Every structure is written in structure tokens, then in C-alpha cells.
Amino acid sequence: EEDAAFEDYCLVFEKEESTYAMPFDSLLGEYLSGGSGYELHGRIIPLSRELFQDNALYFPEIASRRVSLVHRESGRGVEVSYPDFETIAFWTVYPDRAPFLCIEPWNGSGARTGEGDELIHKNHVRRLEPGASHDLSMAVRPLISRTETLPEVLRRSLLPDGGIHPV
């Protein structure tokens, strides 16, 4: 949306979630395996720049295989489906005010504490036999307007003033 603030958007997951984003230690350059960062209970994450002050929001366990980035008032945005991916991460530049949010379905992750250096021991890595291949798919679809494509959960939760509350 033209002239929209970052905070005018939210992430809407297809399923109810009860999970956490793994915290990132910028000094170690690793995700902290035993820690829990941002907690997601429900389907909606209202965006703020401060969510990304410690790096990406990386969800190592997520039930949804579809998420939408939605403008709260217009309902416009994008839907990303990732049926073949096990995890997802979201990031933007912080503290700068970049005009984007990166949505990255992952199989694997950045380095985690205690994981070691061998690729085969990394989380969510798939092993393929020599010469084998494995296809993964994802799709990005524009959300045109609230009435046409906005996920039902958000449509029900929008207040008349454009605000949002949990369903």
C-alpha cells in the first residue's frame, strides 16, 4: 500500500499456532537451541520493527503451510504457500526502515548452538542418495482486496476502525 507504515501490516497463518521463534545470538552468530523467543499463540502477528531487533523470526516448528502478509485496512498483500517446507523465517533490516519483509520458507536453518559443523547433523536437512533429486514448491499469490481474498480469520477480526483483535 502506498504511504503505509510497516506497522499497518500483519502476518496471518492458515492454522492456529502455539509455537515460538528461536532466539538468535548475534555474538555467537547462532540460533539458541534451548531458548524461546517470540511466542505465537493464535494465527496473527501484528508487525513492528522491534520484532526484528535480534535478527529473523525463525519458527523451527510450525503447523501452517501458508501465511499471508496483509494490510490491516485494505486487506491487500501477498499469500505465500510452502507445502514442502518444514520451517519458516521472517526478516527485515533493523534498525533501518527498509520497505520490505522477507518471507522465507526453510528446510534447515542457520547455525544452532550445539549442532556441530557437519551438514548431515543440521536440523531439517534431507539426505539424498547420489544422483537423486527432490522437488520443493512454494507459491506467492497477490491478495487483491478484503472481500476477494483476505483470509477469513482476518476478515472476522477486523474492527470498523481498521484495528485488529485476536479471534
Show the residue positions of the predicted features.
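Glycine-rich active-site loops that engage anionic ligands at enzyme catalytic sites
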Residues: V70-G114
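Terminal connector regions
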Residues: S145-V167
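Residue-level signal for secondary-structure boundary sites
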Residues: T19, I88, A111, I144-R146
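Short Pro-Gly-centered flexible turn/kink motifs
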Residues: R126-I144
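Short alpha-helix capping/helix-loop boundary micro-motifs
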Residues: L119-N123
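Active-site/ligand-binding surface loops and adjacent short beta/alpha elements
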Residues: E1-P83
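Hydrophobic residues positioned within well-ordered beta-strands of beta-sheet architectures
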Residues: R65-V67, L101, L136-M138
